[in-house]
């Protein structure tokens, strides 16, 4: 049976599964689903409804209402209000009811941490071979006949849009973009295989050889099993994960565990019926962290220590990604190994990547998954609209790219070696369970790391500060530089999302952008900076003269230091220019905005053109001097001064869904028009009439506003009347 036939047979077998009977409890849980991603496209009225429900919930708590029935009624009301926020225009990958588990299996899959680890990790030496079955989230396929399957624009843009392919050279082993790529935006170079060990003993291994169709390995063919990069389940050898110590009794110091006692309110600032895009991002972040308030999070945990938020809503993130969504994504889209998907393993202290060449077809991906490999999706927001909406909303609040990776791990497996990253990480546990261990940074210099580490060895790790299991609906935050590793339990798979923010967003990055300009300006305008070095400098300064105490050496050092303090203190305008350079990077990296249906009809994206009886094009919009407009998003543009007194308006509305696929978009504008841009930026989120723009005449106001609107940068207060 060829590869596609095998997969069709596998799909027919899977769809033939008898749907599980839904219980009353499951129906209640379906009604309680909180669709986080819908907040990214919610209208002010819908968010206001949530505020009212949350306010009622808080008031009931203040009045001492502690009865389970009353508390549950209030909680259901608030949750249902959030669920109603889903935008009707959003394409949703909803899971089919045939994949629902019965109530007994669901209760079993979420048993307590203590019970699971008391029996499974008592030896502290190894994890036993897992059993491939449906409740544990494993997938089995067979290509042999007779074998059974287990279901498992007037302003003209002057920039060119040259496609740039993503290469593995942009990333490290842990899929973090290198600082050079983030800051310089150079053309990526292909990554060399088989990198040398780092100074810390980390390993960056080359991809292991793998057959193009792993289904052959599952058919029982001895030759195929022998050539497999990973042990097949047909072999007698038991799979072992890298040994981990026995689970700790409780979380260690410096890590907070917030349990489900809702106290934070999901709030959105409304101004004349207009929702601020930054406040919308704050609203989404608040929903992700609830019941932990944003004030507590940023004052107690942000960039300082880890925090776990435990919840009982297991389907909280189910609208963002699921096992079934991934399977459909592989079928409907052309995803390639290394570019879009990695299959990885970590066994016996060795981290390996098992990527074949070419397209990631479902049989190949699920074959590796069934052999114990983790599946990492590198750009899921390109294909999953709900997840893309969350990232697009959060990037407005954080003023930087919000990335997302999806990790699917089979039972009793670990896909990655211990390491730390250069991003602030939010782990959203979507399905199953996963045991996470966090460790302090290896050294003070690794705290808030600016680059990710290599793969660390178990012997290099200190005592863990956190050792807990994330269940579906839980969230874990940890700062950059925090060492972490995660492993699944013997009877449970894991599906989680990692949201990454604040990569290369520190004062160090500001200084790197600032100091070259400050130095060049000081050299240009100060004679002392251009004077020649004194004769004999080589005889008093340098490594070989470091232990001398001569007057000449002391004078040279003192004078050099005085030049720094006198001429290299940056001015306010120089700091502004450096921040603009960081903002240009954001405009290049940002996801395009997610346009809600209520917004689309007030933007160029909802405009439709027709031809008249003579064949002439007729537009369905007509901006007048009374039309009220504002920017589509608060951070959607950045006005930057260039050399020779030219001005550029950078924008991200035309960005591709792939990371930096094109060069940054910008248009050059006149200084007179810059005043109108400044007004639109400073007045956001208020709408202003076109005639109020600070331009010489009404015609100029209309031309400028029309050009910006046709570029997709503006939204009108009211839809246009259709003729």
UniProtKB/Swiss-Prot annotation:
Residues 190-199 have a biased composition (Basic and acidic residues). It is an enzyme of class 1 (oxidoreductase). It is found in: Nucleus. Residues 49-72, 133-155, 204-213 have a biased composition (Low complexity). Residues 13-34, 48-213 are annotated as: Disordered. Residues 379-518 form the JmjC domain. Binds 1 Fe(2+) ion per subunit. GO terms for molecular function: 2-oxoglutarate-dependent dioxygenase activity; histone H3K36 demethylase activity; histone H3K36me/H3K36me2 demethylase activity; histone H3K4me/H3K4me2/H3K4me3 demethylase activity; iron ion binding. Pfam families: JmjC_2, RIOX1_C_WH. Its EC number is 1.14.11.-, 1.14.11.27. It catalyses: N(6),N(6)-dimethyl-L-lysyl(36)-[histone H3] + 2 2-oxoglutarate + 2 O2 = L-lysyl(36)-[histone H3] + 2 formaldehyde + 2 succinate + 2 CO2. PROSITE patterns: JMJC (PS51184). Fe cation binds at residues 419, 421, 484. GO terms for biological process: behavioral response to ethanol; circadian behavior; negative regulation of DNA-templated transcription. One of its GO terms (cellular component) is nucleolus. Residues 14-31 have a biased composition (Basic residues). Keywords: Chromatin regulator, Dioxygenase, Iron, Metal-binding, Nucleus, Oxidoreductase, Repressor, Transcription, Transcription regulation. Residues 88-106, 114-129 have a biased composition (Acidic residues). Its cofactor is Fe(2+). Oxygenase that can act as both a histone lysine demethylase and a ribosomal histidine hydroxylase. Specifically demethylates 'Lys-4' (H3K4me) and 'Lys-36' (H3K36me) of histone H3, thereby playing a central role in histone code. Belongs to the ROX family. NO66 subfamily. This is Bifunctional lysine-specific demethylase and histidyl-hydroxylase NO66. It comes from Drosophila grimshawi. The lineage of its organism: Eukaryota, Metazoa, Ecdysozoa, Arthropoda, Hexapoda.
């Amino acid at each position: 049976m060829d590869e596609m036939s095998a997969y069709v047979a596998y799909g027919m077998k899977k769809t033939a599964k008898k749907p599980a009977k839904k219980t009353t409890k499951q129906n209640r849980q379906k009604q309680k689903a909180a669709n986080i991603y819908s907040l990214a496209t919610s209208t002010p009225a819908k968010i206001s409804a949530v505020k009212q429900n949350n306010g009622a919930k808080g008031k009931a708590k203040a009045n001492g209402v502690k009865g389970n029935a009353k508390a549950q009624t209030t909680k259901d009301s608030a949750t249902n209000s959030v669920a109603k926020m889903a935008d009707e225009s959003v394409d949703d990958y909803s899971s089919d009811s045939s994949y629902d588990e019965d109530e007994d299996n669901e209760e079993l899959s979420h048993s307590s941490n203590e019970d699971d680890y008391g029996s499974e990790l008592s030896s502290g030496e190894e994890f036993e071979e897992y059993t491939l079955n449906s409740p544990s989230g494993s997938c089995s396929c067979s290509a042999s006949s007779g074998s059974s399957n287990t279901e498992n624009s007037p302003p003209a843009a002057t920039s060119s849009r040259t496609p740039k392919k993503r290469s593995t050279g942009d990333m490290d082993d842990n899929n973090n973009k290198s600082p050079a790529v983030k800051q310089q935006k150079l053309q990526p170079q292909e990554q060399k295989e088989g990198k040398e060990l780092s100074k810390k003993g980390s390993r960056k291994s080359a991809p292991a050889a793998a057959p193009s169709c792993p289904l052959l390995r599952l058919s029982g063919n001895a030759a195929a099993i022998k050539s497999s990069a990973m042990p097949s389940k047909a072999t007698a050898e038991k799979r072992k994960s890298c040994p981990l110590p026995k689970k700790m009794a409780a979380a260690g110091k410096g890590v907070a565990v917030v349990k489900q006692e809702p106290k934070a309110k999901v709030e959105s600032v409304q101004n004349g019926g207009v929702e601020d895009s930054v406040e919308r991002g704050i609203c989404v972040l608040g929903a992700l962290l609830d019941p932990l308030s944003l004030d507590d999070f940023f004052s107690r945990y942000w960039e300082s220590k880890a925090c776990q938020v435990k919840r009982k809503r297991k389907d909280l993130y189910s609208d963002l990604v699921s096992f079934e969504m991934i399977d459909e994504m592989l079928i409907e889209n052309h995803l390639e190994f290394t570019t879009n998907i990695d299959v990885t393993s970590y066994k016996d202290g060795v981290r390996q990547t098992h990527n074949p060449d070419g397209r990631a077809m479902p049989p190949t991906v699920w074959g590796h998954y069934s052999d114990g490999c983790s599946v990492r999706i590198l750009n899921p927001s390109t294909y999953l609209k709900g997840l893309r909406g969350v990232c697009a909303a959060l990037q407005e609040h954080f003023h930087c790219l919000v990335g997302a990776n999806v990790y699917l791990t089979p039972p009793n497996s670990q896909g990655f070696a211990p390491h730390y990253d250069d991003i602030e990480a939010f782990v959203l546990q979507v399905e199953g369970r996963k045991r996470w261990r966090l460790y302090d940074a290896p050294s003070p210099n690794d705290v808030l790391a600016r680059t990710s580490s290599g793969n660390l060895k178990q012997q290099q790790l200190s005592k863990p500060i956190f050792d807990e299991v994330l269940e579906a609906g839980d969230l874990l935050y940890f700062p950059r530089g925090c060492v972490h590793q995660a492993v699944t339990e013997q009877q449970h798979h894991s599906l989680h999302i990692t949201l990454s923010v604040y990569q290369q967003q520190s004062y160090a990055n500001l200084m790197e952008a600032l100091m070259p300009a400050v130095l060049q300006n000081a050299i240009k305008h100060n004679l002392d900076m251009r004077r020649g070095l004194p004769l004999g400098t080589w005889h008093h300064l340098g490594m070989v003269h470091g232990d001398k105490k001569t007057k000449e050496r002391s004078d040279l050092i003192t004078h050099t230091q005085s030049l720094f303090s006198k001429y290299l203190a940056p001015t306010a305008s120089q700091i502004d220019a450096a921040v603009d350079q960081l903002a240009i990077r954001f405009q290049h990296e940002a996801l395009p905005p997610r346009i809600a249906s209520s917004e689309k009809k007030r933007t160029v994206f909802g405009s439709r053109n027709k031809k008249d009886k003579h064949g002439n094009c007729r537009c369905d919009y007509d901006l007048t001097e009374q039309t009220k407009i504002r920017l589509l998003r608060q951070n959607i543009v950045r006005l930057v001064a260039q050399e020779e007194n030219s001005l550029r308006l950078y924008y991200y509305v035309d960005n591709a869904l792939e990371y930096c696929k094109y060069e940054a978009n910008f248009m050059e504008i006149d200084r007179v028009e810059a005043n109108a841009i400044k007004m639109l930026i400073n007045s956001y989120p208020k709408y202003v009439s076109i005639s109020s723009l600070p331009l010489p005449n009404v015609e100029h106001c209309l031309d400028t506003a029309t050009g910006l609107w046709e570029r997709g940068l503006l939204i009108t207060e009211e839809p246009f009347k259709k003729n």
